[in-house]
């Protein structure tokens, strides 16, 4: 029997998006398809409404880390392991970035040709495909942006830097991540929100003229709205905000808080500009859990995690 590691890994790296719609003549409600990306065993996977599809790859280790839907097209992004001698036991392997459009794979390599490349997020706008992650040419990882497979460096390698999230609004490209602290790049121009090496941004969302970034500062889950920080937790327990979604004046954030050495998946919600934060445990402390991605549509909240 094939051993499945769907629960451990597919959801851990998942991204969720609600897509497509069709009218139901009976109740006049929209019905949405939900796509989740991840992997099972050595295979990158895409689930649509819970139905799994194995994404094409070279047969070695591969994962899908993000999913995005634009019109009728479904995009996924991830990594594929490459062994230079053609064997699957080479040491060390290297990784190439991959993305799939409607199941058809495209590959792009790291600039060094041998580094540990990672692809963390995906956004499609105006037919252009944006991916972010990190590459490594020397001692420190370099934050990266790929547009249609063409690599652009966001950092120079002098400091630890990674890119975790990308959002495109009009002609502006926003990337959130880590540059020896919480970092936001707008059109490749860096803004530092903190100088704390134990802090990082993991998600960015743009609504109108407002830019929302979430992550952590040391042990505290934190939201930045237009660069102004707001604590989601008091710092007594280790906590992390991993994803943010804004619908109108409502803000939805997911992540985790550690209690009694167990991670509890969390949802923080703020409804309206003058509303108060509501905190909801999505799991109990019986098993460790992390909420990694959130999407909201028609007042329905979709969360993935592990």
Sequence positions of predicted segments:
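Bacterial signal peptide processing site
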Residues: 22-24
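C-terminal motif of bacterial Sec signal peptides marking the signal peptidase cleavage site
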Residues: 17-20
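Residue-level hotspots at or immediately adjacent to binding/recognition sites across diverse folds
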Residues: 27-306
């Amino acid at each position: 029997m094939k051993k499945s590691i769907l629960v451990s890994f597919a959801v851990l790296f998942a991204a969720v998006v609600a897509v497509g719609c069709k009218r139901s003549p009976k109740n006049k409600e929209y019905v949405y398809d939900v796509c989740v990306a991840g992997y099972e065993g050595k295979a990158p996977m895409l689930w649509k409404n819970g139905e799994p599809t194995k994404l094409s790859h070279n047969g070695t280790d591969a994962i899908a880390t993000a999913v995005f839907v634009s019109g009728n097209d479904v995009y996924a992004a991830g990594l594929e392991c490459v062994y230079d001698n053609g064997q699957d036991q080479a040491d060390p392997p290297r990784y190439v970035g991959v993305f799939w459009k409607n199941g058809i794979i495209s590959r792009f390599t790291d600039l060094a040709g041998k580094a540990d490349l990672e692809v963390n997020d995906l956004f499609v706008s105006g037919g252009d495909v944006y991916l972010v992650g990190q590459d490594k040419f020397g001692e420190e990882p370099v934050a990266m942006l790929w547009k249609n497979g063409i690599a652009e460096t966001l950092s120079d390698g002098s400091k630890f830097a990674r890119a975790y999230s990308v959002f495109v609004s009009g002609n502006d490209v926003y990337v959130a991540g880590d540059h020896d602290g919480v970092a936001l790049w707008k059109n490749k121009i860096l803004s530092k929100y903190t100088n704390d090496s134990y802090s990082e941004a993991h998600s960015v969302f743009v609504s109108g003229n407002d830019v929302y970034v979430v992550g952590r500062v040391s042990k505290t889950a934190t939201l930045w709205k237009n660069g102004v920080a707001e604590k989601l937790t008091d710092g007594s327990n280790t906590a992390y905000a991993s994803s943010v979604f804004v619908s109108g004046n409502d803000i939805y954030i997911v992540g985790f808080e550690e209690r009694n050495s167990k991670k509890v998946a969390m949802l923080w919600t703020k409804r309206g500009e003058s509303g108060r934060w509501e905190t909801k445990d999505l799991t109990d402390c019986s098993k460790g859990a992390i909420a990694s991605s959130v999407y909201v549509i028609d007042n329905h909240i979709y969360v993935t995690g592990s």
